[in-house]
């Protein structure tokens, strides 16, 4: 749904609806109807998943038996951010379609419940979002998944809340090569993706920096700070231009050490990183920076 929404920005909403709207609607209804094997929509509008037996998110490091090294389960912050954004995009496409009225009312009811539940569930007194919430357990690890909740088009968080979260991300996770997968102040931080395969697997999401997360970060920054934030975003992009003259020329590595000198690791070229940096550069171009 997020990809189709991005397509609508490059075309228009009616075109996206005509070509892909029903597909997005069917996917959302599939989840609402409880047909997805590992996603469940609760009465509060939030979507829940079971990540105890196998990794369910992009943070998919696993032990030899397949169980996750980072067992994120329950309400995952990025799953829920993308879920609400998808619901609101559907409503944007079909709000005035009388033939879709019953489905629209259903989506609206869930999105309304979600809007009331998200902040009380995820927002903590420290000013950032829990990485996941499972029953009474709230995960305090400072991870970058919360940037998706402030970087998508639709969020129930107000500007003050988004600014506070973004300030926290900037302070704890931002590096010249992307956002760290874990804050240096969180337990288990390891910025070095080195060693044997087992050591690297454990370090994969424990502090390394990911350029692709800058897509959500920079869009969130511009949404919160407006034109005043563009010079900061532009300065961040200059660092990536320099990086593209290192290693594999014209591209970006899979990940980078979370501490200086931020050495590139993993695959020498990673499409998601290149794509999201290009998305930010396009944002700057469209805003004439």
Protein language model regions, located:
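Intrinsic disorder at enzyme termini
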Residues: 287-289
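Amphipathic alpha-helical interaction segments
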Residues: 66, 91-92, 115, 200, ...
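Acidic/His metal-coordination segments adjacent to aromatic residues that form catalytic metal sites
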Residues: 51-75, 135, 193-204, 254-264
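General structural signal for secondary-structure boundaries
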Residues: 9, 16-19, 60, 126, ...
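Generic long, charged, amphipathic alpha-helical segments
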Residues: 179-214
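Catalytic cores of carbohydrate-active enzymes
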Residues: 32-48, 75, 82-193, 235, ...
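Aromatic-rich carbohydrate-recognition surfaces in CAZymes
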Residues: 1-52, 57, 76-80, 84, ...
């Amino acid at each position: 749904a997020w990809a189709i929404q991005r397509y609508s920005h490059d075309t228009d909403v009616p075109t996206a609806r005509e070509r892909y709207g029903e597909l997005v609607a069917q996917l959302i209804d599939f989840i609402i109807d409880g047909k997805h094997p590992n996603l469940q929509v609760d009465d509060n509008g939030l979507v829940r998943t079971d990540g105890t037996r196998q990794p369910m998110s992009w943070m998919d490091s696993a032990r030899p038996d397949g169980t996750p090294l980072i067992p994120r389960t329950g309400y995952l912050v990025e799953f829920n951010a993308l879920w609400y954004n998808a619901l609101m995009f559907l409503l944007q496409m079909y709000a005035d379609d009388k033939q879709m009225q019953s489905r629209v009312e259903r989506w609206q009811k869930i999105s309304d419940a979600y809007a009331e539940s998200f902040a009380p569930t995820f927002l903590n007194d420290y000013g950032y979002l829990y990485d996941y919430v499972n029953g009474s357990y709230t995960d305090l690890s400072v991870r970058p998944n919360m940037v998706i909740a402030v970087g998508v088009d639709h969020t129930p968080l107000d500007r003050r809340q988004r600014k506070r979260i973004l300030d926290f991300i900037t302070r704890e996770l931002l590096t010249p090569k992307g956002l760290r997968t874990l804050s240096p102040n969180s337990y288990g931080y390891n910025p070095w993706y080195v060693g044997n395969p087992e050591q690297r697997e454990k370090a994969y999401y424990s502090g390394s920096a990911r350029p692709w997360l800058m897509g959500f970060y920079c869009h969130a920054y511009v949404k919160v700070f407006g034109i005043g934030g563009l010079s900061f975003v532009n300065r961040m992009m200059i660092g990536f231009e320099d990086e593209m003259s290192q290693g594999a020329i014209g591209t970006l590595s899979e990940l980078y050490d979370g501490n200086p000198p931020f050495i590139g690791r993993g695959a020498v070229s990673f499409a998601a990183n290149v794509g999201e940096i290009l998305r930010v550069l396009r944002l700057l171009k469209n805003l004439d920076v």
